[in-house]
């Protein structure tokens, strides 16, 4: 059973999709999971498969639209990780308010950018009883530098500095691309074969061509979950990495090595970054379900 819901974060009306077993009712006392999307993704793009897995396993899940995406209010397409972390924390509060949910059994699943954001939340919010981080981005600056030359990076930083001045004088950030296959006109650079496939992806179509703002680059510069990952303990954390992840490389290994127990690392053999979203969702979700059942049920 799926239900489109709304909740408020920082005064903005945000949207999400609540998924629950058909027999869920007031007093069911079911564990709940907040699903935290990746970069520029939405609740109804890629994530239904994750939610369906949780429903079948007896969980109530909330897949959120961050501010500025899907049906949520906010600056369209802008991705400021610390604000998204705030939105996800408020999603926990909403899930705790549901009569079907046990408020003391809440978990987080984050994918890609969301994979690092859930680490930030778990490090400071002990309402979270278990967390799973899938094909995560471990450091925003390191990811933005990937596939760029030093000169391209310097050019991008000059654009960011000019936009900082523009924002304080006009109140607006310049429009920018979320990702391109090269150059300095996007937040991220992706290999051409990935960029071409993403042009037809549902979430990009909904957001009209992966448009964001230059302020997003500034937000990513401050995003460094690798620096706080040791603070997640004693909350148990699972890392799911794709063996051939061409985007996030060894980020999961880095964070796993710095995290404290209880922790676990699962590798999707032969997998690439976007395999977890569809082709191999079932395989990637198996260790997540086992992890959450161990600590929540």
Locate the predicted segments by residue.
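N-terminal cap/lid segment of alpha/beta-hydrolase-fold proteins
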Residues: 1-28
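Alpha/beta-hydrolase-fold enzymes
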Residues: 107, 119-196
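Short beta-strand/loop motif that positions the catalytic acidic residue
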Residues: 232, 239-241
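Conserved alpha/beta-hydrolase "acid-adjacent" motif
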Residues: 245-251
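Catalytic active-site module of serine/aspartate enzymes centered on a nucleophile-bearing elbow/loop
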Residues: 271-274, 278-297
């Amino acid at each position: 059973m799926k239900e489109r819901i709304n909740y408020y974060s920082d005064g903005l009306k945000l949207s999400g999709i609540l998924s629950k077993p058909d027999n869920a009712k007031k007093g069911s006392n079911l564990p709940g999971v907040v699903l935290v999307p990746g970069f520029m993704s939405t609740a109804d793009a890629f994530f239904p498969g994750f939610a369906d897995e949780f429903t079948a396993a007896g969980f109530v899940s909330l897949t959120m639209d961050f501010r500025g995406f899907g049906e949520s209010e906010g600056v369209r397409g802008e991705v400021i990780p610390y604000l998204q972390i705030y939105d996800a924390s408020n999603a926990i509060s909403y899930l705790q308010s549901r009569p079907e949910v046990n408020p003391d059994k809440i978990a987080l699943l984050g994918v890609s950018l969301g994979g690092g954001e859930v680490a930030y939340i778990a490090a400071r919010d002990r309402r979270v009883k278990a967390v799973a981080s899938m094909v995560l981005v471990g450091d925003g600056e390191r990811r933005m530098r990937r596939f760029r030359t030093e000169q391209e990076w310097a050019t991008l930083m000059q654009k960011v500095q000019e936009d900082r001045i523009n924002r304080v004088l006009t109140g607006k950030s310049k429009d920018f691309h979320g990702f391109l296959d090269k150059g300095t006109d996007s937040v991220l650079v992706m290999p051409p074969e990935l960029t071409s496939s993403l042009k037809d992806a549902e979430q990009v179509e909904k957001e009209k061509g992966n448009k964001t703002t230059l302020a997003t680059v500034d937000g990513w510069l401050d995003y460094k979950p690798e620096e706080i990952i040791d603070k997640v303990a004693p909350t148990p954390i699972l890392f799911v990495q794709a063996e051939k992840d061409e985007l996030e490389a060894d980020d999961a290994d880095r964070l796993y090595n710095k995290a404290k127990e209880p922790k676990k690392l699962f590798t999707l053999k032969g997998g690439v970054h976007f395999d977890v979203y569809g082709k191999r969702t079932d395989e990637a979700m198996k260790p997540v379900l086992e992890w959450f059942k161990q600590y929540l049920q």
